[in-house]
């Protein structure tokens, strides 16, 4: 009986592992598709005359909280001033 329980537990564990792996594989494929879609949008953006590097910077900044962004901008300005770049 103990062997039956162990065998059943192993079967369940293998099934769970397989399910996790298959979910990850599906998500990785979706991630690739989304990445391709994003590249297409950037290509459209560029063909419309927008600077994709600047847009990427804006997107990065929009992800931050206001205080984080302001702190980063202040540090950037401080460093630029120190280097005579302002």
UniProtKB/Swiss-Prot annotation:
It comes from the Bacteria. InterPro entries: GapR-like, GapR-like_DNA-bd. GO terms for molecular function: DNA binding. Belongs to the UPF0335 family. This is UPF0335 protein BCAN_A1790. It comes from Brucella canis (strain ATCC 23365 / NCTC 10854 / RM-666). The lineage of its organism: Bacteria, Pseudomonadati, Pseudomonadota, Alphaproteobacteria, Hyphomicrobiales.
